[in-house]
C-alpha cells in the first residue's frame, strides 16, 4: 500500500505528478479544497463547522481541517492507498496527520519533495498570459499560442498578465511557501520517509523518478 504526500513549491509540478501517480497506482487523490467543498455541500457536521469560519472570512482551524481529513481517510476508496494534496502545510498539521494515520492504521509510506530552483519557478509561474478578448490562458514556456501574438481560440491579438503572475509577486508567494515547506521537509526527513526528485526535468522523467521510489517500497 502507498500512502503518499507530495511536497514542492508552487509551479514545481505536483499536480501533473499526482495525476500520473493516481493513474498508475489507483490511489485515492485527496485534495483539501475538494474535501471542504464536498463537506459543505453535503452539510456534514464538520463541513458546517468549516463553513462557519469561511463565511466570516476566517481561516479554518487546523483541528477542523484534520477532522475533515480523518473523515475522508475513512472512506473505502482509500483502502489501496492515498495521495494527499494540500495537507499538511505546517508541522502542526503534520503532527495531527500522524495521530490520524496511527488511529486509522494507515501510516504514511512516502513523502516525496519535487525540487525546482527558485529562478526556474519564477520563470514558470510568471510566464502565464491571458487573451483580453476571450480569457483563454497561455504559458510562454509550456503552452504558448500556436501563432505568436494570436489567440488560438478567438484570433485576438491583445493579451494581459494577472497581477499575481508578475515576477515580484510570484517571488513573494514562493518565499511564503518556502517558510512553510522547509520545516515540513525537516519533519519528514527525521521520520526517514522523505525522498527528493529533480522537478526541472520533463514531467515524464519526473514521474519516472517518482515511480522508481514508489516501486522500491
Swiss-Prot record:
Residues passing through the membrane, by range: none
EC number per UniProt: 2.7.4.3
Cited PROSITE patterns: ADENYLATE_KINASE
InterPro entries: Adenyl_kin_sub, Adenylat/UMP-CMP_kin, Adenylat_kinase_CS, Adenylate_kinase_lid-dom, P-loop_NTPase
Keywords: ATP-binding, Cytoplasm, Kinase, Metal-binding, Nucleotide biosynthesis, Nucleotide-binding, Transferase, Zinc
Compartment annotation: Cytoplasm
Biological or metabolic pathway of the protein: Purine metabolism; AMP biosynthesis via salvage pathway; AMP from ADP: step 1/1
Region (NMP): 31-60
Entry keyword Nucleotide-binding: yes
Stretch list, region LID: 127-165
NCBIfam families in alphabetical order: adk, PRK00279.1-2, PRK00279.1-3
Similarity comment: Belongs to the adenylate kinase family.
Domain notes: Consists of three domains, a large central CORE domain and two small peripheral domains, NMPbind and LID, which undergo movements during catalysis. The LID domain closes over the site of phosphoryl transfer upon ATP binding. Assembling and dissambling the active center during each catalytic cycle provides an effective means to prevent ATP hydrolysis. Some bacteria have evolved a zinc-coordinating structure that stabilizes the LID domain.
Protein name: Adenylate kinase
Organism listed in the record: Lactobacillus johnsonii (strain CNCM I-12250 / La1 / NCC 533)
Amino acid at each position: 500500500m502507498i500512502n503518499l504526500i507530495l511536497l514542492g513549491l508552487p509551479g514545481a509540478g505536483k499536480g501533473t505528478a499526482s495525476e500520473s501517480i493516481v493513474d498508475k497506482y489507483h490511489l485515492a487523490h485527496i485534495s483539501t479544497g475538494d474535501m471542504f467543498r464536498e463537506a459543505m455541500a453535503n452539510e456534514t457536521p464538520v463541513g458546517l463547522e468549516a463553513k462557519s469560519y469561511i463565511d466570516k472570512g476566517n481561516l479554518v482551524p487546523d483541528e477542523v481541517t484534520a477532522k475533515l481529513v480523518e473523515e475522508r481517510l475513512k472512506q473505502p476508496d482509500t483502502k489501496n492507498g492515498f495521495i494527499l494534496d494540500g495537507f499538511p502545510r505546517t508541522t502542526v498539521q503534520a503532527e495531527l496527520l500522524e495521530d490520524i494515520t496511527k488511529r486509522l492504521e494507515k501510516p504514511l509510506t512516502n513523502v516525496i519533495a519535487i525540487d525546482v530552483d527558485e529562478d526556474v519557478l519564477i520563470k514558470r509561474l510568471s510566464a502565464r498570459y491571458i487573451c483580453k478578448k476571450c480569457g483563454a490562458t497561455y504559458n510562454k514556456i509550456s503552452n504558448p499560442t500556436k501563432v505568436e501574438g494570436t489567440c488560438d481560440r478567438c484570433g485576438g491579438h491583445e493579451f494581459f498578465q494577472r497581477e499575481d503572475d508578475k515576477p515580484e509577486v510570484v517571488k513573494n508567494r514562493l518565499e511564503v511557501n518556502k517558510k512553510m515547506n522547509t520545516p515540513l521537509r525537516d519533519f519528514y526527513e527525521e521520520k526517514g520517509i522523505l525522498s527528493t526528485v529533480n522537478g526541472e526535468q520533463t514531467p515524464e522523467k519526473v514521474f519516472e523518478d517518482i515511480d522508481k521510489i514508489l516501486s522500491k517500497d
